[in-house]
């Protein structure tokens, strides 16, 4: 097995809870905004997908900060359901505050895992389908920025493609950001199809199913 130089992580569902799936739960889940305001299940799912498509590939720019993008996101959400006349507790600021309530580590042992990998001399990176504002809240609130160099953070909103793209742009960008060959990277994701795509591009893949399983799989690659 070749030398492993970098471990690249997805964010939602691996390092932090997936904000979208809890704040705007999919059809199979309950909770979040949908239940709090009695919104139609299918409509919330539809609007969530539309807004994801609109912001997943939209980067922060010199004239548009991530906070402005976040406010624009919730303004569009409110307009769709209440046409500028939302009920009490459904303002832009209310939804931003609610977002923070759903920003949590997947497991409290995540920081120790990252520290352990750093102590072994491994470079850590991120490859995530994420918008700018939820990523900033996840990494800022959970104090994860210290583990990842800015150049090693690859997001769909910055690359302009998702991990499902046929061109493998996200995986190529991640390997390039680490300045190592694909074969020297381990990629960790909670979605099996993303892991399979990373492997098809030459990376080692780990399908995340829990912290203990992840540690065992990492040790298998690093100590094998």
Language-model features, listed with the residues they occupy:
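Substrate-recognition "cap/lid" segment bordering the active-site pocket of phosphatases
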Residues: 132-184
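C-terminal cap/substrate-recognition subdomain and adjoining C-terminal extension
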Residues: 180-182, 199-207, 211-224
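N-terminal helical cap/lid subdomain that shapes the substrate entry/recognition surface
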Residues: 2-108, 112, 119
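Short catalytic/ligand-binding loop motif for oxyanion handling, primarily in non-cytosolic enzymes
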Residues: 15-19, 23-25, 133-137, 162-163, ...
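Short beta-strand segments
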Residues: 8-10, 17, 125-129, 157, ...
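Acidic, divalent-metal-coordinating active-site segment for phosphoryl/phosphodiester hydrolysis
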Residues: 170, 190-203
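Conserved SAM-binding loop
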Residues: 187-188, 207
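Glycine-centered short loops/turns at secondary-structure junctions
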Residues: 119-121, 202
């Amino acid at each position: 097995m070749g030398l492993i130089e970098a471990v690249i992580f997805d964010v939602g569902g691996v390092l932090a809870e997936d904000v979208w799936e809890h704040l705007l739960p999919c059809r199979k889940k309950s909770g979040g905004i949908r239940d709090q305001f009695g919104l139609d299940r299918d409509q919330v799912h539809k609007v969530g997908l539309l807004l994801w498509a609109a912001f997943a590939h939209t980067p922060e720019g010199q004239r548009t900060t991530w906070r402005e993008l976040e406010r624009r996101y919730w303004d569009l959400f409110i307009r769709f359901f209440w046409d500028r006349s939302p009920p009490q507790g459904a303002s832009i600021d209310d939804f931003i505050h609610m977002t923070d309530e759903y920003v949590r580590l997947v497991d409290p042992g995540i920081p120790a895992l990252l520290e352990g990998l750093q102590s072994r001399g491994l470079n850590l990176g991120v490859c995530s389908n994420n918008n700018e504002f939820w990523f900033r809240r996840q990494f800022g609130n959970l104090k994860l920025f210290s583990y990842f160099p800015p150049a090693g953070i690859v997001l769909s909103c910055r690359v302009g493609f998702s991990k499902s793209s046929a061109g493998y742009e996200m995986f190529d960008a991640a390997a390039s950001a680490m300045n190592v060959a694909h074969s020297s990277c381990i990629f960790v994701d909670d979605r099996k199809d993303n892991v399979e795509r990373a492997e098809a591009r030459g990376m080692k893949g780990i399908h995340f199913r829990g912290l203990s399983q992840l540690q065992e799989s990492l040790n298998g690659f690093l100590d094998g």
